[in-house]
Curated annotation (Swiss-Prot):
Subcellular location: Cytoplasm
Pfam families: ACPS (PF01648)
Entry protein name: Holo-[acyl-carrier-protein] synthase
HAMAP family: AcpS
Length: 127
């Protein structure tokens, strides 16, 4: 059964401007430590950051809360499996919250094109 759905879209040029002004601050605030390591290796860093920002916002929307109340950007890490499909890794704190809400699965889809990055999240609970 679906617990919640969240979607978010981010303008990549906006993220690019933020990175040009305060790269270190934005990266430390939005990306987990693991994501920061991958970010350092990326050629298209603004798209990478925009997709992660969008995914974390969409996740918070699917929970029905905003970033900062229960979940922070640091509580979520976005990884990719061998086929390139994105998935979430949760902090221990967030895992406890999800268990309390009976949320068993999180589905994530990411997309980008020239100007925008988008994320779509579905959270499932057990019947």
């Amino acid at each position: 059964m679906i617990y919640g759905v969240g979607v978010d879209i981010v303008n990549i040029e906006r993220v690019e401007r933020i990175l040009s002004k305060n790269k270190e601050g934005f990266v430390k605030r939005v990306l987990s430590e693991y994501e920061q390591v991958l970010f350092a290796k990326k050629g298209d860093s603004s798209t990478y950051c925009a997709k992660r920002f969008s995914a974390k916002e969409a996740f918070a929307k699917a929970l029905g809360i905003g970033i900062g109340k229960i979940v922070s950007f640091q509580d979520l890490t976005i990884c990719n499996n061998k086929q390139g499909n994105p998935y979430f890794i949760f902090s221990a704190k967030l895992c406890l919250y999800l268990v309390d809400k009976n949320i068993k699965k999180a589905h994530l889809s990411l997309s980008d094109e020239k100007f925008n990055a988008m994320a779509f999240v579905i959270l499932e609970i057990e019947n």
